Structures are given as structure tokens and as C-alpha cells.
Amino acid sequence: VRIHIIKMTIHLVKIAVGIESIDHLRDLQLERICRAKEEGVHDKLIHLTRNTPRRRNEVLQNGSIYWIIKGYIRVRQHIIGMEKVVGRNGQQLCALVLDPLLKKTILLPHKPIQGWRYKEEEAVPNDLNEDEIKSSLPSSMAEELRSLGLL
């Protein structure tokens, strides 16, 4: 008898500290990619963390990082790799290699957290489709309506 262990995809959820909007996140990430290219360091979009996720293999099975912006999960990015790097002070870090494409999600309120949290597939919000993106309310209005229980 053979037993097959199927590893499920796990996602990361993290606060985008200091980020005001999805556009702000996009601009900052683009700036970082350009700066790294100019300095000849690399041409990838990376996000540095102190620790490598223990569930690395599950995250790398099509996992994403879901960004909390202003109290809501609003957007995600596919994690395409993880690399060990050395920081400026010689500290070992983990570079999450991200797909630059930001995919808007259904707004999902989330409490503040430190670091990241793992989330199963069922616990993360669905992506918005093109029609939903085009017809969606401005995020500030949608937030207000949600807080009032009207959405």
C-alpha cells in the first residue's frame, strides 16, 4: 500500500507597513526594482524577511503573499521563489521573490499582525475579476460602506 502525501498550497499574509494604497505599493516596488537594476544587484522584485518560512515548500507550490493595506487584505502577489541573502549588516535574510503583477482581491478586513501569518487556500479572499475591478467602488467608499454593514 502506497500513501501519497499531497501538500497543499499555503499563502502568506503580511502588513504592507507605511503603504497607503495599492498604487503606492506598486510605485514603491517599481522604484526598488529600478534601484536594484541600477546598482547591478539583481533585476527581481524581492521582499526581505528575517526568517525563512518553515513551510517554504508549501508556499512555493503556487502560494502568494496577501498584503494588508489600511486594515484590509486588498491585493496579492505570487511568490515565485525564496533565496537566502546576506543583509548589509551581515545578517542572514530570506528574499521572497515576487511576481511584479499585483492582483486585486475582494476586500477582507484583517487585524494588525507582526511578521507574517500562514493562510490556507480557503482562508484567503478571491481575486477580483476584470468586470468587478471596472465596476468597483473607490476603495475608501467601499471601506466606509463595509464598516457600516452595508456591503
Q: Where are each of the predicted segments found?
A:
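Short, well-structured alpha-helical interface segments that form or flank functional binding sites
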Residues: 20, 61, 140
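Intrinsically disordered, low-complexity linkers and terminal tails enriched in Pro/Gly
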Residues: 2, 38-40, 130-133
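Well-ordered alpha/beta subsegment
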Residues: 114-151
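Short, solvent-exposed amphipathic alpha-helical segments in soluble enzyme
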Residues: 30-31, 83
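Short, well-structured hydrophobic secondary-structure segments
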Residues: 33-76
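A generic structural signal for short beta-strands and their flanking turns/coil linkers
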Residues: 11, 61, 92-94
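Aromatic- and Lys/Arg-enriched surface recognition patch
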Residues: 77-125
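Short, extreme N-terminal leader segments that mark the start of a protein/domain
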Residues: 2-29
